[in-house]
């Protein structure tokens, strides 16, 4: 009898072991393929919170489609989707105006080329790290595929801070950055663009260096000036597109932007041209911001003044309040406490949290249009 019990115990232990391995590899009855993948992403990228957040949101949103088609699991489609094809980290050394040498870190994540060459912007900001570049590159896959064009997804950048740097310092940094980057990009391989901290000026410096090194003039960078191969309306496209999308959303509810009070965060390309288009459709935009705080203008943001300050003088948003007598600058504050009908987060990732979302609802906001990459936290979305 004792021998039989021992045999049964060993058998039970073996069965449990097989079940444990199977559950971890293929998912148990209580854990779906999507749940397995979310856990896999969290465990494998534990030090990359932004990427984990983006991947989790995407995976959860495609749950019904994936779980209705076993083929995706059989071919390990999601395992391949969440892993970049190539990630490059490189050193950038450059000299400031005093001759002192500085070193920054550069990144290029080439996430997916299933339907075409990698495509995605370059971001210069001190917060840049591998997690942020991976999250941006991952989301770029889907944004690009939705255009219907044969382009894949990627992203890059550096922890270089352009604020407070002279024109020559920015030029030297961009040239050094491209000297390291040019080896992994090309018109049929990877086509970078601009993002935070990288506008037409920076793209021009990098394109010039690429042309100097390779002797080629092909369109390896988008966002160039019109005089050397750029596209009309490239600068305005994202901001205008955001407002057109919000207008169509409202039309589905027998409403429109006309006559609405709008708060916008940010003061870069996306924010500036979202403000411009919202004003042209009859909306009243009352805020703009940067990392130092925001301005509130009860008369409506004056786009010409905003462009002069941010694009020509490259000054802080606080300068706007000095030019407009009725405008007020709020240092270190967010725009979400300002009463509005529509909110357009156009600054950076995770800028709109759960408490901000509650504040918007309390103040009567009826629509949120996301212009930045993942501007709302998961809690805010819920």
Task: Label the model's feature ranges.
Residues 5-8:
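Short hydrophobic targeting helices and cationic amphipathic motifs
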Residues 14-30:
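Short, Lys/Arg-enriched N-terminal segments with co-localized hydrophobic residues
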Residues 31-232:
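N-terminal ligand-binding/catalytic initiation module
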Residues 117-118, 219-230, 312-323, 336-340:
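Gly-rich Lys/Arg/Thr-decorated short loops/hinges at beta-loop-alpha junctions or inter-strand turns
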Residues 233-334:
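Glycine-rich phosphate/diphosphate-binding loop of Rossmann-like nucleotide-binding domains
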Residues 258-261, 340, 365:
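Phosphate-coordination loops involved in phosphoryl transfer and adenosine-cofactor binding
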Residues 323, 329-340, 344, 354-360:
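A glycine- and small/hydrophobic-rich beta-loop-beta segment
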Residues 347-382:
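Rossmann-fold NAD(P)-binding glycine/threonine-rich loop
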């Amino acid at each position: 009898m004792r021998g039989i019990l021992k045999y049964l115990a060993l058998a039970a232990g073996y069965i449990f072991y097989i079940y444990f391995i199977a559950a971890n590899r293929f998912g148990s009855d209580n854990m779906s393929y999507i749940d397995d993948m979310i856990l896999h992403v969290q465990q494998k990228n534990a030090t990359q919170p932004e990427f984990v957040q983006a991947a989790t949101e995407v995976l959860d949103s495609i749950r019904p489609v994936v779980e209705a088609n076993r083929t995706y699991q059989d071919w390990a489609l999601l395992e391949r989707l969440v892993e970049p094809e190539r990630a490059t980290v490189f050193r950038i050394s450059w000299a400031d105006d005093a001759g002192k040498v500085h070193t920054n870190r550069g990144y290029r994540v080439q996430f997916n080329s299933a339907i075409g060459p990698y495509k995605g912007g370059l971001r210069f900001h001190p917060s840049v790290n591998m997690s942020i570049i991976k999250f941006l590159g991952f989301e770029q896959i889907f944004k690009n595929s939705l255009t219907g064009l044969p382009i894949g997804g990627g992203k890059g950048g550096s922890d270089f801070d352009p604020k407070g740097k002279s024109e020559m310092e920015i030029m030297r940094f961009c040239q050094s950055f491209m000297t390291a980057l040019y080896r992994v990009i090309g018109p049929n391989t990877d086509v970078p663009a601009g993002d935070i901290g990288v506008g037409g000026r920076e793209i021009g410096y990098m394109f010039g260096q690429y042309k100097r090194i390779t002797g080629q003039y092909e369109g390896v960078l988008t966002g160039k000036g019109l005089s050397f191969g750029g596209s009309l309306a490239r600068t305005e496209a994202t901001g205008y597109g955001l407002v057109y999308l919000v207008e169509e959303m409202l039309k589905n509810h027998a409403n429109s932007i006309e006559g609405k009070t709008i708060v916008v965060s940010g003061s870069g390309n996306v924010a500036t041209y979202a403000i411009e288009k919202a004003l042209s459709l009859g909306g009243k935009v009352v805020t703009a911001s940067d990392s130092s705080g925001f301005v509130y203008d009860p008369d409506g943001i004056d786009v010409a003044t905003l462009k002069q300050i941010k694009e020509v003088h490259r000054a802080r948003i606080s300068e706007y309040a000095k030019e407009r007598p009725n405008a007020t600058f709020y240092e270190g504050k967010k725009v979400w406490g300002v009463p509005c009908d529509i909110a357009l987060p156009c600054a950076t990732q995770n800028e709109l949290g759960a408490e901000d979302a509650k504040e918007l609802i309390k103040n009567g906001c009826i629509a949120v249009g996301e212009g930045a990459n993942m501007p709302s936290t998961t809690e805010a979305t819920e």
